[in-house]
Amino acid sequence: MNEVMSDPMDPTNPVRFSVLRVPFFLEPAYDTDESFSETNRVRLERKWGGKAAFAAQKHSHRLKERGQEVGIEKFNLDRLASSTLKSHRLIQWITKTRGCEVAEAVYNDLNHRHFVDGKKLNDAEMLCDAAAAAGVDRDEAMRFLESDEGLEEIGDAQEMLQEMGIHSIPNFVVGGKVVVSGAVHAAKLVQIFRRLESTGEGAPGSAFADALRIPPEMRAKTLPAPGNA
């Protein structure tokens, strides 16, 4: 996105991006109680059928290299895996009430706290710390997490994912229509963005904004251009 925003085809009509993170659960059967967690190493060795099989998968997926591409120098394999319901709810709530710029700041912070520092994503105190670091009122964030708000919307989004045949991540839905599956390189996404940019009309819409109840005024908010953040 930064590449396209930094070098627009038409400087008088630069592209802007609105990002909506759609909740997806790698472990939907995980207990949502905050006391539950296990190390990611244990989770993946179980998933792939043992240490040797996990090592082979790790090598073939080039996770280290892909992580470095998005600013994660080294994945903490012993990070705490837990239910991600609370973190998904928090990101959706911030998107609805503050817009995608603040939501992306919290999302990126949570990625570092989890993948690098090893924190678990159902820790309400940690989640509120991340929200506060982005300027969100900490007490307000905690009150939200202690409520049941946002659960119905996340359930609706899960139904949409099933209907669209999306059963893994990462997946990118661009403009509500173009689906790009897998950990593609940034160059592939740039091609898609440039193709949309060349029309001069922008993307047609969002596939999930209605299901996630994103208000129109928040859908209109965009990420700042590089250098303007």
Q: What are the functions of these language-model segments?
A:
Residues 1-10, 21-22, 92-229:
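C-terminal cap of thioredoxin/glutaredoxin-like
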Residues 2-114:
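Structural alpha/beta surface segment adjacent to cysteine/selenocysteine redox centers
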